[in-house]
Amino acid sequence: MAKEKFERNKPHVNVGTIGHVDHGKTTLTAALTKVCSDTWGGSARAFDQIDNAPEEKARGITINTSHVEYDSAVRHYAHVDCPGHADYVKNMITGAAQMDGAILVCSAADGPMPQTREHILLSRQVGVPYIVVFLNKADMVDDAELLELVEMEVRDLLNTYDFPGDDTPIIIGSALMALEGKDDNGIGVSAVQKLVETLDSYIPEPVRAIDQPFLMPIEDVFSISGRGTVVTGRVERGIIKVQEEVEIVGIKATTKTTCTGVEMFRKLLDEGRAGENVGILLRGTKREDVERGQVLAKPGTIKPHTKFECEVYVLSKEEGGRHTPFFKGYRPQFYFRTTDVTGNCELPEGVEMVMPGDNIKMVVTLIAPIAMEDGLRFAIREGGRTVGAGVVAKIIE
């Protein structure tokens, strides 16, 4: 029987493998493509195709990432896998590959290791909402008590970082057996099928950008004589309709106004939607009341803040970053959406300096408020040159 043609009408979900080096992330990624293609259709990818991850640039940072896709009975998955630990750190902090959920791969023979912990912590910091666990290499463990012990350790670790460890699904299996098409004791092919069915049920379908509350970062402001002030930008999420109220948030005190027109390519429209570049005409707003770096948003959905905890990756010298470390009291610019704001960096206790190539948790205080929420990405710049990337982990004030 011929495979059915690829249908775009299944819901699309982004996932990725995380976990310690050599615990089997890439083998599992290959097994997922094979088992899904055999079970539900689609094409398989070989281990070495995935392992030679192409280099890509996100915000000027070089990251090696492999992208594969596979189908379950009800969904289409886009899956990212990184060859090295540093690639994970960069990927998660820059949001180059946003994950709706992560598959934590942990070797049943070794149990949780330092990167297992670090990837769970990173997932918490960057806002990965769901984790499903695959206890791999179960074919190398004969002792059921040992498996139980490792499972308990993983659950404890998840609880430590505010994931629901006791309720997290844990699938026990062998990615290598699944890849070889074997299924002794149900730990090969059927374990991977069970993993995919668990992704289907445990990770909720993400809310599409268009269904979220309206937000547009302002890129430019014009005044059109006789008509008023127009702000332009790309709608990040939601829909704006003519005659709807909007708030202008960030940098100055929040103000309210009404959208009296939407235009795109010089044509008037009834609405602007997520992903579109539009001009929005604002009623009674003066040219000098609005500036680049503010956002237009559905009233009450986003607030301006100045102080937050964040997870930051500092570019290495090879990536065009700093050549020297920085110390507490470092004051670079933080580039949010469309503008730079100066901020002061407070390092964690016991950390004296931060080297290029490090990732670090720190608290930043900006000199002007920016419309922000947890999970917002930013760049760190010095005089227009990017020296780091970060993500808001927790707003403080």
UniProtKB/Swiss-Prot annotation:
Region entry G2, spans: 60-64
Phosphotyrosine PTM positions: Y77, Y88
Gene3D superfamilies on file: P-loop containing nucleotide triphosphate hydrolases, Translation factors
EC code: 3.6.5.3
Catalytic activity: GTP + H2O = GDP + phosphate + H(+)
Segments for region (G3): 81-84
Stored CDD domains: EF_Tu (cd01884), EFTU_II (cd03697), EFTU_III (cd03707)
Annotated stretches, region: G5: 174-176
Domain tr-type G residues, every copy: 10-207
Region (G1): 19-26
Major subcellular location class: cytoplasm
Enzyme class: hydrolase
Keyword Metal-binding: yes
Residue numbers binding Mg(2+): T26
Keyword Magnesium: yes
Residues reported in the UniProt entry to bind GTP: 19-26, 81-85, 136-139
Spans annotated as G4: 136-139
Keywords: Cytoplasm, Elongation factor, GTP-binding, Hydrolase, Magnesium, Metal-binding, Nucleotide-binding, Phosphoprotein, Protein biosynthesis
Domain of life: Bacteria
UniProt-listed Pfam families: GTP_EFTU, GTP_EFTU_D2, GTP_EFTU_D3
Subunit field text: Monomer.
Job description of the protein: GTP hydrolase that promotes the GTP-dependent binding of aminoacyl-tRNA to the A-site of ribosomes during protein biosynthesis.
Similarity-based family: Belongs to the TRAFAC class translation factor GTPase superfamily. Classic translation factor GTPase family. EF-Tu/EF-1A subfamily.
Protein known as: Elongation factor Tu
Gene symbol of the encoding locus: tuf1
